[in-house]
Regions:
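A short, Lys/Arg-rich alpha-helix, primarily the initiator
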Residues: 1-18
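Alpha-helical and His/Cys-centered functional microenvironments
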Residues: 13, 34-35, 60
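Short, basic-rich loop-to-helix N-cap that marks the start of a DNA-contacting helix
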Residues: 39-52
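Short C-terminal boundary/hinge segments that cap the last helix of small helical domains
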Residues: 55-69
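Short alpha-helical "recognition helix" segments of helix-turn-helix
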Residues: 22-23
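Recognition helix of helix-turn-helix/homeodomain-like DNA-binding domains
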Residues: 28-42
Length: 69
């Protein structure tokens, strides 16, 4: 699953969250957060945990699948 990194970083900035703090809030490792920010995919479970930590619906932070659109 691909996270919309631009939106994720905006939400982090708005909430004053560092990668470390987002990792703590979401229960996801800092390394995983860093990989996502650098464009890697993640599992739906990880995306969901990040969405919850950012107080967003999952659909708000996940990139839409343009191949099926």
């Amino acid at each position: 699953m691909k996270i919309n990194v631009f939106k994720m970083q905006i939400l982090m900035r708005e909430r004053g969250l560092t990668i470390k703090k987002l990792a703590e809030l979401s229960g996801v490792s800092r390394q995983t957060i860093s990989c996502i920010i650098s464009g890697k995919s993640c599992t739906p479970q990880v995306a969901y945990k990040i969405a919850i930590a950012l107080e967003q619906e999952l659909s708000q932070i996940v990139k839409e699948d343009v191949e099926n659109g």
